[in-house]
Curated annotation (Swiss-Prot):
Its EC number is 2.7.7.60. Keywords: Isoprene biosynthesis, Nucleotidyltransferase, Transferase. The record marks 20, 27 as: Transition state stabilizer. Signal peptide: none annotated. This is 2-C-methyl-D-erythritol 4-phosphate cytidylyltransferase. Pathway: Isoprenoid biosynthesis; isopentenyl diphosphate biosynthesis via DXP pathway; isopentenyl diphosphate from 1-deoxy-D-xylulose 5-phosphate: step 2/6. The keyword Nucleotidyltransferase applies. It comes from the Bacteria. One of its GO terms (molecular function) is 2-C-methyl-D-erythritol 4-phosphate cytidylyltransferase activity. PROSITE patterns: ISPD. The keyword Magnesium does not apply. It comes from Protochlamydia amoebophila (strain UWE25). The gene is ispD. Catalyzes the formation of 4-diphosphocytidyl-2-C-methyl-D-erythritol from CTP and 2-C-methyl-D-erythritol 4-phosphate (MEP). Belongs to the IspD/TarI cytidylyltransferase family. IspD subfamily.
Length: 230
C-alpha cells in the first residue's frame, strides 16, 4: 500500500570532521564505488518528488559536489557549527513556514525511500518521528572507572538512526529550552523530548548504518556490492 506523498524539507548534515575515521578527509566525503558517501545520501533524498527544498550543511569547499546535481527544487547551503545541534540550528534558520523537517546524517547512505515516507507519515500525525532499530546486544551502564552499575532491560532499548523528522515549530521550541539551559543534545528528537512532546519510533533497517569508523567503511562497501540487500 502506497503512502500519500506528504511534502517536507530536508536538512542534510554534512559538516562533521569524522575524527574516528583517522583520515584527513571527513568521513562523509570518502568514496564508496567512486562516489562520496554524502552524495549517495543526497541523491537518494533528491529523487523524492515531495521534497520542497534541500538544505545542505557543509563547508564551502564541498558545495560543488552537490551543485553539479541538477535539482528541480531549491538547494540552499548552511555552515556547520561546533556541535551537531549548532549545525542543525544553522540549517533550520533558513526555513520559512512550519513544514516537516527531515534531518539526515549524510554518512548514512543506505536509507530507503519507503522508510523515509513511513517516518514522514508518523511525523505528520505526531509532530515528530524517527527511524530506529531494536538493540540486539546487551547494554551495560558503567561508572567512570568502567565498572558496571546496572543492566537496562533490552526489551525497551532502541538505537536511533536518521532521518529524524520534526515539525519546524517543535524544533524551535526545543532549541529555546536547550539554549536557555545551555544543554547539549546527542540527536535531533532529543529537542522534542525537552518540551515533553511525543516522538514516534518507526522500525528501520540494520543496513542503515552510519559510516563512522574504518570498519564501517568496509561494511558499507560490502553492502553496495550486494544490491539485493537494498
Amino acid at each position: 500500500m502506497e503512502h500519500q506523498l506528504i511534502p517536507f524539507t530536508v536538512v542534510l548534515l554534512a559538516g562533521g570532521m569524522g575524527t574516528r575515521m583517522k583520515n584527513l578527509i571527513p568521513k562523509q566525503y570518502l568514496t564508496i564505488q567512486e562516489k562520496p558517501i554524502a552524495l549517495h545520501s543526497f541523491e537518494k533524498l533528491a529523487s523524492m518528488p515531495e521534497i520542497e527544498q534541500m538544505i545542505v550543511v557543509c563547508e564551502p569547499q564541498y558545495e560543488q559536489l552537490f551543485t553539479v546535481y541538477k535539482l528541480n527544487k531549491p538547494l540552499i547551503f548552511a555552515r556547520p557549527g561546533l556541535r551537531r545541534q549548532d549545525s542543525l540550528w544553522n540549517g533550520i534558520k533558513l526555513i520559512a513556514g512550519n513544514p516537516l523537517v527531515c534531518i539526515h546524517d549524510s554518512a548514512r547512505p543506505f536509507i530507503e525511500i519507503d522508510r523515509i515516507r513511513q517516518t514522514v507519515a508518523e511525523a505528520e500525525k505526531w509532530g515528530a518521528a524517527v527511524l530506529g532499530v531494536r538493540v540486539k546486544a546487551t547494554i551495560k551502564i558503567c561508572e567512570e572507572k568502567q565498572f558496571i552499575v546496572n543492566t537496562p532491560n533490552r526489551a525497551f532499548l532502541w538505537e536511533m538512526q536518521t532521518p529524524q523528522i520534526v515539525r519546524l515549530k517543535l524544533l524551535y521550541d526545543g532549541f529555546s529550552v536547550a539554549q536557555k539551559n545551555e544543554l547539549t543534545v546527542s540527536d535531533d528528537v532529543s529537542l522534542v523530548e525537552l518540551i515533553d512532546k511525543p516522538v514516534k519510533v518507526v522500525e528501520g533497517s540494520y543496513l542503515n548504518i552510519k559510516i563512522t569508523t574504518p570498519e564501517d567503511l568496509l561494511i558499507a562497501q560490502s553492502i553496495l556490492k550486494n544490491h539485493a540487500l537494498l
